[in-house]
Amino acid sequence: MVRFLLFILFMSCQPKYDWLDTLPKPWNLNRREFSSYLPLFQKKYPNFSNRIKAFSLWQVGKPYQLFCLGEETGKDLDPIFRMDVSDCTVHILTSIASVQSKNWDEARSNIIKIHYKKDPNGISMPTYKSRWHFTSDRIQD
């Protein structure tokens, strides 16, 4: 009986993710539509861990394209932020940037902070040279 009650208590404390099934897929949305869902994620999942899990689950099934982020200029013309295609790294980066944002432009700004090294003045500028190219580069002591 105690196990059953603990199970019920545990399950009732878990966030519900079935709401995600009611949403259109993020890769089918334009920027304005995508922006309209970001505040809903913050309201529905106020806890950061639950929100990032929910957002990550929402992206499952997105078309796969390797090396799909760039600087929009210079050596790599791919977009800085995108939701139409993804690879493993982009999935994580867009999730982290999006769940901390209220709209597309803020998510784009956040991904620059996450995906690019800071210059000597502490500013992250999207250039090929300043991009974190390897996961191991992101590991700080």
Regions found by a protein language model. Give the residues of each.
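Sec-dependent signal peptide recognition
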Residues: 1-7
